[in-house]
């Protein structure tokens, strides 16, 4: 019966049951109610699985008191330029910058402190606009940001901190960035460099590589075929290195070809009236049976369009469990053409080291069967399960098939070391003594996918043929460098995504039926080299040929030019986005002449390289401020007794501050230079890390530039405790403890023989040797420890139970 048809007392009974105490109701066999069930669970939230289960039934709701504005009514009465603070927080950054320039900047000279605050506010807003995040609002939850957006937000914090002599390491900052904004990002990174900082950037974007001062190429291949320095030097000369794949693509010797013919859609999935975030009653047709790219600048509505509109509504349509609320739509027509909609992301497949490519691809069972069929295995009665490292008697008894042991390092991070018994093979000696074609099962798991494919392809037999067929799929998706026994939790995001695509192809082989799935991929080019993209595009073509539909959110021009169909959203991000700019083949997108995607796609189709164009960079006004080079420039210091001091302290030299006691030396050195340097460095750190550090007071100054991260060495006049020593202060004692814990050898206090630990199997072998040597051993269990007294009754009790002997003070009785 529907909820709306129930009477009020029936609803109350369902919700609250027959009483207030759910435990008492349960014991009496009465209904404890839905609320009682959750009350029972809330009392057991100390258990992890209970907290995870409860999280499925929780959602965020707007506060009924402030209605999502976060402030009390009294605070809402204060306004600037006719707007309250929550109203400003809901404005996009580009609009907020214009508002500040109109209403706040003209009044900045009214107060010295206000002038500094306005300058800092404007600089951060300008930086956010510069790196392509002008569509974000300041009240936007960081939980909803993509990895690339979070990294660029952090980059603006680094720019605002004005640090120098700092090493910044960036991991693919162009993730989620449209080619329009790449030049802006490069300009921002160049400004960090000009301030005396060093940048190390992990990146595959062509324009970023060409804009680098030094390009380091690692390789030449992946996995075991990589790990070498192929090239280090000017980007323009990498093309001279024959073995460099990067050089081959940058020099034009090798290119990803434009498809000669593009597939025509068979049917369409018609979406009407879709609304979510900046999507407002969007109408669009998604072609089926082809490779479609969903493009647009950052914040144009691509991810909500694919995930919230299509994927979540597909779950509802197919009757699957949907833990998130799907986007509102008027209608979606064409579901009958699809069997399933799958979101293929880069999240880890598993988090345990026990799953491997061989297990995930379904070849490990076949490999174990082949070893169980050998003469040695049959003679010993070994079944396929004996060759499993996840269970059974064949795995190493010490590490239980893990191949490594976790070593706790106390105040340092824990490390994993190779198991000393199996030496990382995961198996016991009995399994490792079984050979097939000169290899035991540990040798096979140590082979790469490519080597194993070559090995099993040369063999005859149905099992070897099935193994080779499945390994061939892994090879085709570009995972030939993985070893069969590599733990899946060590794979990169791109490798995880390709392995998931391989699983779809493998399932197709196993079932033999051609199902029609829509596969949604959000920026699969993340972390991929040109050569990896070439391999992935071949997988896309194979999936489409099997009848699947691919909807790929991507900014990389190599993907867009290879697509059969393009849906371009925009034209801008945030409130300026959410509209369909153009649809059609890549050539039709270029011919339409609308939006930014067509402009950059034209260059790619014509074969022109992607380069950094300073004209595309929006340089903030704050970037033109006069910043002295080679010095820490302090202006307007009024902290404590300082009288508006201006001072330039040269970097890389020793500067001595002197003067009478109380003249302001410590205020200048510690309260300004040290405190401000540490505070700015802490600002660059994540909010989570900052909560564990002391927040220093911001000094009363107008401006301080050219400041590196700082360390203070002070005179501490307080006496340490009785346990404080030079060793504890210098941390020598902590490292000595760790040294003895890891390398110390225990010795018997009586005979001086070294004491060592033994595994269960080693103890069994030792007992067996002693039995052979002495003919018999007595196994004794303690009955009384550390107590004096008469225990004749205890001896008679033991005799009555059938025990043969009692030992008292090491004397047999």
Kindly give the residue locations of the regions a language model identified.
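Conserved phosphate-binding elements of NTP-dependent enzyme cores
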Residues: 1-812
